[in-house]
C-alpha cells in the first residue's frame, strides 16, 4: 500500500529538502494544496510538483483553497459564494493539469438550492475532466449527509478524516456508511477532545483496529497522513517522519490481517 503525508507536516523546512526528507523516510506520495496564502511555506503548486517529481514522490490528493470562516457563503446567494465556487473550479483544473488523484473539499453551512447548483456545476467539470471531488467529514455531519442524499454524481466522492471523526462524531461510522464513496484519507490521531493532527504515541484515542477492518474492504487506498508535528515536543523533523511512517506501517499490518 502506498503511504503518504501532508507536504507541510509541521516543521519549517525548505521545500526541496522537505520533499527529500519525506522520500528518504519511506513515503511514496504527498498531499498538498495550491492555496496562495501558503506559497511562503510550500512554494507555488508548479514548483511543488516539480520538486515531487525530482525526488520521486507521487501525487495523492489536492486540498481545496479556503478560509474556514468563509465556507458558509457557498450556500448563500452572494458574491462570496460565487467566489468560492470559482476557486473550487480552479482547484479542479489544477488537479487535472498536474495529475492529482482528487480534490478534497470542506463543506460547511446551511444546505440550499443555490449551493446545490454550485456544487453540481463544479461536479459537471469534474465529470468532464475525470477529477473526483472528495467531501471531507469535518464538523458538519448534517450538511455532509444532505449533500450525499441530494446530489448524485460518479465524481462525488468521500475523504475520510480519522481525527475529525474522533472529535466531532465518533459514534458515526463514515467508513462503513460511505464505503462505496471512499477515495482518499486524512489519517491522524487526537485525545478525543480537540483536533490535534498528531500521532497515536503522543495523544492517541482512536481505535485503529476498527479503521483497519473497514479499510481492508477497500482496493488501492493510499494511507495518507495529515499530521502537524510542531504540536509534539522535542522531536526533529526527521524523527517525526520516521514515527509517522512506522504508524503507517503498523496500520498496513492491521489492514492485511483483516484481509485474511
Which residues make up each language-model segment?
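Acidic/histidine-rich catalytic cores of soluble enzymes
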Residues: 30, 62, 120-205
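N-terminal pre-domain/capping segments
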Residues: 1-90, 96, 153, 242-260
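Alpha-helix-loop-beta-strand connector modules within alpha/beta enzyme cores
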Residues: 48-66, 120-129, 208-213
Amino acid at each position: 500500500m502506498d503511504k503518504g503525508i501532508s507536504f507541510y507536516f509541521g516543521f519549517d523546512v525548505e521545500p526541496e529538502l522537505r520533499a527529500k526528507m519525506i522520500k528518504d523516510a519511506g513515503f511514496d506520495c504527498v498531499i498538498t494544496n495550491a492555496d496562495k496564502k501558503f506559497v511562503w511555506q510550500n512554494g507555488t503548486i508548479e514548483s511543488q510538483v516539480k520538486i515531487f517529481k525530482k525526488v520521486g514522490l507521487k501525487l495523492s490528493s489536492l486540498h481545496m483553497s479556503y478560509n474556514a470562516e468563509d465556507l458558509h457563503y457557498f450556500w448563500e446567494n452572494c458574491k462570496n459564494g460565487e467566489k468560492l465556487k470559482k476557486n473550487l473550479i480552479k482547484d479542479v483544473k489544477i488537479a487535472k493539469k498536474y495529475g492529482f488523484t482528487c480534490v478534497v473539499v470542506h463543506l460547511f453551512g446551511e444546505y440550499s438550492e443555490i449551493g446545490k447548483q454550485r456544487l453540481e456545476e463544479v461536479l459537471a467539470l469534474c465529470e468532464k475532466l475525470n477529477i473526483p471531488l472528495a467531501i471531507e467529514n469535518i464538523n458538519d455531519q448534517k450538511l455532509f449527509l444532505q449533500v450525499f442524499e441530494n446530489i448524485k454524481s460518479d465524481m462525488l466522492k468521500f475523504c475520510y478524516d480519522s481525527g475529525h471523526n474522533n472529535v466531532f462524531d465518533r459514534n458515526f461510522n463514515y467508513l462503513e456508511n460511505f464505503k462505496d464513496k471512499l477515495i482518499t484519507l486524512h489519517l491522524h490521531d487526537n485525545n478525543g477532545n480537540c483536533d490535534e493532527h498528531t500521532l497515536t504515541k503522543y495523544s492517541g484515542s482512536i481505535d485503529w483496529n476498527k479503521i483497519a477492518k473497514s479499510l481492508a474492504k477497500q482496493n488501492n487506498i493510499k494511507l495518507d497522513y495529515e499530521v502537524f508535528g510542531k504540536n509534539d515536543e522535542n522531536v526533529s523533523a526527521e524523527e517525526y517522519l520516521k514515527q509517522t511512517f512506522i504508524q503507517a506501517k503498523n496500520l498496513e499490518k492491521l489492514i492485511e490481517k483483516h484481509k485474511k
